[in-house]
């Protein structure tokens, strides 16, 4: 017997994942889902959050590679002074 995956396919992009996540949150906040559907939506939302976090981490790594030696430690005091 083969194991069925109840999860929907992963989105094709970060933006698609965020859009689906926003829709899930709106439906859950509106209270329009029955209990079983709410649990399924929560599970799907968790998968989407993990996907988005992985995509952001991947892009962050790429940016660090591209910037190489140009990376400098963040100085909060200087950032505040620059805003003033």
From Swiss-Prot:
Domain of life: Bacteria
EC number annotated for this UniProt entry: 3.1.11.6
Subcellular location field: Cytoplasm
A molecular function GO annotation: exodeoxyribonuclease VII activity
Keywords per UniProt: Cytoplasm, Exonuclease, Hydrolase, Nuclease
UniProt xrefs under InterPro entries: Exonuc_VII_S, Exonuc_VII_ssu_sf
SUPFAM superfamilies xrefs: XseB-like
UniProt key word Isomerase: no
Keyword Hydrolase: yes
Description of how the protein assembles with itself and partners: Heterooligomer composed of large and small subunits.
Recorded family membership: Belongs to the XseB family.
PANTHER family to which the protein is assigned, alphabetical: EXODEOXYRIBONUCLEASE 7 SMALL SUBUNIT
Protein name, per record: Exodeoxyribonuclease 7 small subunit
Species of the source: Herminiimonas arsenicoxydans
Gene for this chain: xseB
């Amino acid at each position: 017997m083969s194991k069925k995956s109840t999860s929907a396919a992963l989105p094709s992009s970060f933006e698609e994942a965020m859009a689906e996540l926003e829709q899930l949150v709106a439906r859950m906040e509106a209270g329009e889902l029955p209990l079983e559907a709410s649990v399924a939506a929560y599970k799907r939302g968790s998968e989407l959050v993990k996907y988005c976090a992985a995509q952001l981490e991947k892009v962050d790594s790429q940016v660090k590679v591209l910037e190489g030696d140009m990376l400098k430690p963040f100085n909060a005091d200087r950032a505040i002074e620059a805003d003033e």
